[in-house]
From Swiss-Prot:
Species this protein is from: Bacillus subtilis (strain 168)
InterPro entries referenced in this protein's UniProt entry, alphabetically: YydF-like
Name of the molecule in the record: Putative exported peptide YydF
Source taxon at top rank: Bacteria
Function: Suggested to be the precursor for an exported, modified peptide that has antimicrobial and/or signaling properties. Synthesis requires YydG and YydH; the peptide is proposed to be exported by the YydIJ transporter. In the absence of the transporter, the modified peptide activates the LiaRS two-component regulatory system, possibly by eliciting cell envelope stress. This activation can occur in trans in cocultured cells lacking either the transporter or the whole operon.
Annotated signal sequence range: none
Induction: Repressed by AbrB. Induced in stationary phase in LB (rich) medium; the transcript is present in log phase cells grown in modified competence (MC) and MM media.
């Protein structure tokens, strides 16, 4: 069970790192970007124009 939790945490960390990498690319665009976590525990990227 402990290994499963560790694997899940690793996947979440990799997903979050990917989101941060993407946000750095998007930050170069003059716009407002945000992240929201859904009820299904998924990250949603949005833009406010």
């Amino acid at each position: 069970m402990k290994k499963e939790i560790t694997n899940n945490e690793t996947v979440k960390n990799l997903e979050f790192k990917g989101l941060l990498d993407e946000s750095q690319k998007l930050a170069k665009v003059n716009d407002l970007w945000y992240f929201v976590k859904s009820k299904e525990n998924r990250w949603i990227l949005g833009s406010g124009h």
